[in-house]
């Protein structure tokens, strides 16, 4: 069964998570520089079967688009142009960064380790993907 990939796209960094082949468990894959995201994905898609890509949709508490929406929309357009046959689903990414930070605290990471923003982005993508899998059941 092909995998599902989640992208937490940001201005500087992009967190990426992937499911196992049974689409049961979400795991962090990596964090990359955002400007390299299309090249990274192109390479990844040649190595792994992916049936769908989830892309975080930043929203404010009231459901309105956040200030980073324009950046994400430009990425989505670029993604669609490069991978026209790939299924995309937009998912609400509110609170994922806070949940990622709390996960780091709960897992016992020291303060210096918790300041690793790349790790926060990867965990955020993983939380987004696991939430999607839970709702899919």
UniProtKB/Swiss-Prot annotation:
Entries under CDD domains matching the protein: YqgF
Origin: domain of life: Bacteria
GO molecular function per UniProt: nuclease activity
Compartments where located: Cytoplasm
InterPro entries (alphabetical): RNaseH-like_sf (IPR012337), YqgF (IPR005227), YqgF/RNaseH-like_dom (IPR006641), YqgF/RNaseH-like_dom_sf (IPR037027)
Single GO BP term: rRNA 5'-end processing
Record-stated family: Belongs to the YqgF nuclease family.
NCBIfam families the UniProt entry points to: RNAse_H_YqgF (TIGR00250)
The protein's name: Putative pre-16S rRNA nuclease
Organism for this UniProt entry: Flavobacterium psychrophilum (strain ATCC 49511 / DSM 21280 / CIP 103535 / JIP02/86)
């Amino acid at each position: 069964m092909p995998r599902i990939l989640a992208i937490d796209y940001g201005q500087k960094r992009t967190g990426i998570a992937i499911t196992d082949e049974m689409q049961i468990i979400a795991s962090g894959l990596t964090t990359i520089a955002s400007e390299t995201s299309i090249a990274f994905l192109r390479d990844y898609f040649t190595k792994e079967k992916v049936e769908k890509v989830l892309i975080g949709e930043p929203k404010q508490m009231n459901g309105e688009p956040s200030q980073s929406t324009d950046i994400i929309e430009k990425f989505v357009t670029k993604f669609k142009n490069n991978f026209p046959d790939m299924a995309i689903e937009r998912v609400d990414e509110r609170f994922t960064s806070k949940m990622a930070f709390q996960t780091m605290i709960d897992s016992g990471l020291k303060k210096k380790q918790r300041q690793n923003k790349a790790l926060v982005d990867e965990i955020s993508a993983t939380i987004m993907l696991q939430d999607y899998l839970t709702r899919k059941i």
